[in-house]
From Swiss-Prot:
The keyword Transcription applies. One of its GO terms (biological process) is regulation of DNA-templated transcription. GO terms for cellular component: chromatin; nucleus. Predominantly expressed in kidney, pancreas, ovary and testis. Detected in brain and in many other tissues. The keyword Aminoacyl-tRNA synthetase does not apply. It comes from Homo sapiens (Human). Residues 142-176 are annotated as: Disordered. This is Doublesex- and mab-3-related transcription factor C1. PANTHER family: DOUBLESEX AND MAB-3 RELATED TRANSCRIPTION FACTOR DMRT, DOUBLESEX- AND MAB-3-RELATED TRANSCRIPTION FACTOR C1. Belongs to the DMRT family. The gene is DMRTC1. Keywords: Transcription, Transcription regulation. InterPro entries: DMRT, DMRT-C1/C2_C. The lineage of its organism: Eukaryota, Metazoa, Chordata, Craniata, Vertebrata.
Length: 192
């Protein structure tokens, strides 16, 4: 297959700088992207070639404005284009720079005392929940072995008449009972 004869090629240089498409013919020493259009031999349609400078062009954030322009594949502004190419121009506006320190998660500092307090509160709630589960699961126990109204405090001395403990039939034996505080409501006593 024979190579086609070499013909002079006219090139129109379109420069994209800072996101705007311009038709200027000069080259700047900035990082920029060039669009070259060159006609092919024996065809009315030209080839579209893209070239880029060695340094990458960093694009900032959007908003985006779109503009459509007609470009003749032959590059000749006087001749009507056979098949026009439609190019969209993106105009990007810079946004605020992001500081790496601002991207790190901002966690409030909690004191050790607050952590210990939260842990002990959680531990008390866990123990109370376990006690309630044990109480629920012990439904087979005789009714006199569980006392929900027994106070957490030991009974007053025999000479003190201010507090009267519950009747002896509901009072658990001291050696086999366990009392758990459940907040403002009182205590749960579990008997084995």
């Amino acid at each position: 297959m024979a190579a086609p004869p070499k013909a002079p090629i006219r090139v129109r240089n379109l420069t994209i700088r800072a996101g705007a498409l311009t038709g200027k013919e000069n080259n700047m020493l900035q990082p920029e992207t060039h669009i070259f259009t060159a006609p092919e031999e024996g065809s009315s349609q030209g080839a579209l070639l893209l070239g880029q400078a060695p340094e990458p062009l960093s694009l900032p954030c959007t908003p985006v404005t779109l503009e459509q322009q007609l470009v003749s594949p032959s590059g000749d502004p006087h001749r009507a284009p056979a098949l026009p190419s439609i190019c969209s121009t993106l105009i990007l506006q810079p946004c605020a720079t992001l500081d790496p320190l601002l991207l790190q998660p901002q966690v409030p500092k909690v004191s050790d005392q607050a952590l210990v307090s939260a842990h002990s509160e959680w531990q008390r709630k866990l123990e109370a929940a376990e006690a309630l589960l044990t109480l629920r699961n012990s439904a087979q126990a005789p009714p006199d072995s569980i006392s929900l109204h027994q106070p957490c405090n030991p009974p007053a001395p025999a000479g003190d008449k201010g507090f009267q403990p519950p009747s002896p039939s509901l009072r658990p034996r001291p050696a086999s009972s366990i009392s758990l505080p459940i907040g403002h409501l009182g205590c749960i006593s579990l008997l084995s």
